[in-house]
Each structure stands twice: as C-alpha cells, then as structure tokens.
Amino acid sequence: MRARTIKRIINQSHTDAYDLMLETWQALDKDFAQVIGDAMHDDECPATMELADFFDEYAEVAYPLASNIKCFVRTAHAVLENPNDSDFNKIVALTDICIELGQDLDGVFLDGLNMLKPYAQQYDLSSIANAIRDIREFILVMNDGFAKTRDGINAVRGGE
C-alpha cells in the first residue's frame, strides 16, 4: 500500500517523502475520480445523481488539499535550500491547513458512504468503498506526518 510506504519514509524525516506524498495523493485522487466516473457512466448504477453530488463535495475539499500539499512541498524544498523563519512559519501554517482539510475530506467520505449505503443492495459499490478506504488511510498517514513535521519545527524553534 502506498500510504504505508509514505509513513515509513515520513518517519525517517526525509524530504523525498514529501515528493512521494504529493505523487501518491495525485494518484489516489485520479483513481478515485476514475472509479466514480466509471460508476456514474454505468447504466446499471441506480445512484448516478448521488455520485455526482458526492464527487462535487469531494472536489470542494480535495482540490484545495492538493494545492496546499503542493505548496507545502515547494516550501519544504525551499527550507532545505535556505532555512528561514518565514518559511518555517509557512510550513507550520500549511501543515495545519492540510490536517484540517484531510479531516474535512474524511467527513465528506463518511457522509458519502452513508448516502450510498441504500444502493449497496442493488449495485456493487466495492470499488468506490476501496478507493475511499485507500484515501482515508493516506489521510491518516499524511496527517500524522504533517503533525510530526509541525511539532518537530515548533520544538526546534522553541529550543527543545
């Protein structure tokens, strides 16, 4: 699983982990969009309107999350080149934003799964559930990594 690889690398505090995190997020997002799109275009699927609403809610959180992850990665690389307090402040703020968006996305998934539950008897939603499970696992690992990064920066800046 990609999320487990990220967790291992983030725990090693290596900046390549941030690049891998971004690549993994982009792949998971693409996979999720494909799974939802396939279901929406399946004539057998009774929940196409619900899936469209679900994907719209997903996009409202997922795209800002992707943007903030990209900004975090750029800033993390900049800090390696030339560490300064301004970039440290930006990284801490971005970790907080990404953690919050990750939690929001988890809420969107829970709502979406509840919305789709009535259709589970009529239609095989396992591919959607699996894609959601992969992203939720990634979010847990990502948020843990961001929290460790934030706490590490704050500890260093606080003289710990």
Where on the chain are the PLM-derived regions?
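Sequence/structural signature of long amphipathic alpha-helices
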Residues: M1-E160
